Amino acid sequence: MTDTFQHISVLLHESIDGLAIKPDGIYIDGTFGRGGHSRTILSKLGEHGRLYSIDRDPQAIAEAGKIDDPRFTIIHGPFSGMANYAEQYDLVGKVDGVLLDLGVSSPQLDDAERGFSFMKDGPLDMRMDPTSGIPVSQWLMEADLDDITWVIREFGEDKHARRIAKAIVAHREDETKEPLTRTSQLAKLISEAAPKSFKEKKHPATRAFQAFRIYINSELEEIDTALKGAASILAPEGRLSVISFHSLEDRMVKRFMRKESKGPEVPHGIPLTEAQIKALGSANMKTVGKAIMPTAQEIELNPRSRSSVLRIAEKL
């Protein structure tokens, strides 16, 4: 952990407890971040336990390099590749627990150069892995009005999506204006585009910045693939512990766990034999307890934990 950007792991003990860690078990931390969850898992493992952590952020990989432990392996890549990594390390069906801590880490938000925050001026980037893909600034220069509107509405759930998109396109087409290359420029533009009646407690740019970040990093597709991958590599009684930070993420996690715990749907109105019904398969997982929210004490200590939700499921 650097001296400049500190990170407090959200729902740390609850998410680790949800894994029901065995000292000699095999675990995957799909989101290493700054290592809070990984280090806690390692502290609970015995000599024969193993932890494989994943992250696509080069800064996270550098932080992981500080852990000198033969039980620990760091993998540089997106967590959507979890099933592939498990195959490479011969872990399919042997993993006792998978942890996913979704969203942006505090160091990413606090480092203005990453371009995630509307509170600090920096390059308008927002890529989790700055070495791949295109920055938000480039996408905003190329996307049309309908695409920008759709992204803000779909991933930011912002009712002023069209209004904001029009302001962005108008700015882009005005040759007297500087191109949108800084977070402060975009935040100011969105604030000015917001109706004067705007009364939300959040900054007017909150939802749009979330939307652009989710879109540019394909976050929801990554989560969907990671959840399916985790379910496919867990051992019987293996646990999946997932922390989400906004309604879109939590909705995906909730639906996935519910679907996996119910099994495939039997088509209505089509007579099937018992053998045919069995062939459809059965439930793959079961949910463990109810959704867990941060305590008032944790929120006071770490305000960014306010919107977090932890859900746990177990492989059957």
Curated annotation (Swiss-Prot):
Keywords: Cytoplasm, Methyltransferase, rRNA processing, S-adenosyl-L-methionine, Transferase. It is found in: Cytoplasm. GO terms for biological process: rRNA base methylation. The keyword Transferase applies. GO terms for cellular component: cytoplasm. Its EC number is 2.1.1.199. Transmembrane segments: none annotated. GO terms for molecular function: rRNA (cytosine-N4-)-methyltransferase activity. Specifically methylates the N4 position of cytidine in position 1402 (C1402) of 16S rRNA. Its main location: cytoplasm. Belongs to the methyltransferase superfamily. RsmH family. It catalyses: cytidine(1402) in 16S rRNA + S-adenosyl-L-methionine = N(4)-methylcytidine(1402) in 16S rRNA + S-adenosyl-L-homocysteine + H(+). This is Ribosomal RNA small subunit methyltransferase H. S-adenosyl-L-methionine binds at residues 35-37, 55, 79, 101, 108.
